[in-house]
Amino acid sequence: MNDTIYAPATGAGAAAVAVVRISGARSADIVRGLAGDLPKPRRAVLRQLTRDGVALDDALVLWFQGPASYTGEDAAEFHVHGGRAVVEAVLEALAAEGLRLAEPGEFTRRAFENGKLDLTQAEGVADLIDAETEAQRRQALGQLGGALSQRYEAWRGLLVQALAMLEAAVDFPDEELPEDVAARARPGLEALEAEIGAALVDASRGRRVRDGYRIALVGAPNAGKSTLLNALVERDAAIVTSTPGTTRDIIEVPLTLGGYKTLLADTAGLRKTEDTIEAEGVRRARAWAAGADLRLWVIDAAMFHVKQDDELAVIQRGDWAVINKIDLVDAGRLAELRATFSEQGLKVVELAARKPGGAEPARAALSTHVIDALSGAEFPAATRIRHAESLTEARTYLQRALSDVGLEVELVAEDVRLAARALSRITGRIDPEDVLDRVFSSFCIGK
């Protein structure tokens, strides 16, 4: 991190304002060279940027003296007019001074390496930039603010405290320490194991908020899946024709429901076919549906009359039966279908997707369902697979430590140490020296 880096902080393309940022030891000299002087830290000043005596632009210049900056280093920002030529001129001037174009995420990486952020907070920055819904914004902002870090560090602190006592019993057996320290540590370890278990249950919710709740539209050809998709997203995302088998591949469309991001997928009609391309579409439909959070079995109210094994193979209890084209059947037929699907443990939604406003029953029901599925968690939710993997590892070591209580204290201590390291990997902060600090501060060793 000895070199000074630069990069545009705003998107490409013409805009009213563009921001170019730099970070590194040469930042102050670069600001003086382009702007003529170095402003007071953290104050915006209007300066004309020049290169070799030629004006580049009138800009707002901000100077941040490390470590009081985003990266923890000396840094600066140039707020220039957003025309492409202006931005290119400023970037060329920085490159001519020997600065290096930053790699993707390098400013945030420097912030992490300088202790301004931990890994979960750095991930929160990325998630906040990518946030498309209010729920994603709230979750990312909480993560950036340290909600996950604080929980993981609190858990790790409990483990370090228990480990300090266990290590002391091993390393200083002649000191006046509480008897059977492993047994005394057990209640706290049990409580922590349960908390981590609950967080793991909640981790899938966090990933769904971040990545989107996956909803598959499945059913026979010409049941109205594509029509329903288009009605829900309010545009012609899928081709609709009267020819069965029109949809051959998965059509994924993002849709915000209840303030949460969802991914709605129109899939190939499920049926046996000799057509190689259609058969591949059916295979992909089954695979996508199997990994979906919810499957909507779209049924043609007028045509459905026998058990359709190709469709039922992907349906699970708790999925939905969407009875479509209800405008084509009478009340008796509708009641018969409703009873049939309810008996199979499916939630029934009735609609006529091709009619104006016909998809609203599905939209309203889906919004309620997604809110119920993704809101109201007790914990700040883990958002990435690596979080869940480290939490699972920590929980496994805790369970092993609890099974070792009553055996050698060294075994319990080692498992607790490994559990603490697993939690440390989530935030990127691993410091084995703090175990020794706890030992010497908690006990009067050598008295």
UniProtKB/Swiss-Prot annotation:
Enzyme class: hydrolase
Binding site for GTP: 222-227, 241-247, 266-269
Required co-factors: K(+)
Binding site for Mg(2+): 226, 247
GO terms of molecular function: GTP binding; GTPase activity; metal ion binding
Keyword RNA-binding: no
Chief localisation class: cytoplasm
Domain TrmE-type G: 212-371
Name this polypeptide is given: tRNA modification GTPase MnmE
The species this protein was found in: Caulobacter sp. (strain K31)
